[in-house]
Amino acid sequence: MANNKQIGARFEQEFVEILAKEGFWAHFLAPSPTGAQPFDVIAMKYGCAFCFDCKTSVKPIFPLSRLEDNQILAFDKWLKCGGHTPCVAVKYDNKIYLINYTRLQREGSVDLRTEKVWREVKE
C-alpha cells in the first residue's frame, strides 16, 4: 500500500499528463532539497500562465489549512504579479476538482460534494 507522499506524487504526475493532453505546456516543479516548493505545477496555454497545487483527500471537506505557508505566500505573490487565479487540484473519490484559491481563502474550506467535477479518473 502506498503512503501519502507516494499517492500525492502519483497525482502530481497524473495531473501534469492530463493538462498536457488538454494542450497545455505543463511542468511539475520538483521540491528543493528541504522539501519546499512554491506550488506543484505551472502550466501555460494561449499565452496565459496558471499555477496549481495538487492535493489528494479522503475527506469531502477541503480546508485552506491543507496548504502550507510557503504555498499561500507563493499564490499571493503570483496574484500580485498579475497571474491568473491559482487553483488547488484536489483528487477525491476518483474525481479531480479545481478549487479557486481566492475562494478557498475567503471561505476557509470547500465541500467537494457540492463542486463541479473537472475530471473523473480511473484508479
Regions inferred by a protein language model and the residue ranges of each:
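Short, conserved beta-strand edge motifs with alternating hydrophobic and charged residues
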Residues: 29, 51-54, 89
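Conserved catalytic cores of phosphodiester-cleaving nucleases, focusing on short active-site segments
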Residues: 19, 41-43, 47-60
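Acidic-basic catalytic patches of nuclease active cores, encompassing PD-(D/E)XK
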Residues: 1-32
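Short connector loops at helix/strand junctions that flank enzyme active sites
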Residues: 36-38, 47-51, 70, 81-83
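Nucleic-acid nuclease catalytic cores
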Residues: 76-104
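Intrinsically disordered, low-complexity terminal regions enriched in charged/polar residues
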Residues: 97-123
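Active-site metal-binding core of divalent-cation-utilizing nuclease and nuclease-like domains
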Residues: 25-47
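Active-site-adjacent loop/helix micro-motif of nuclease/hydrolase catalytic cores
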Residues: 58-72
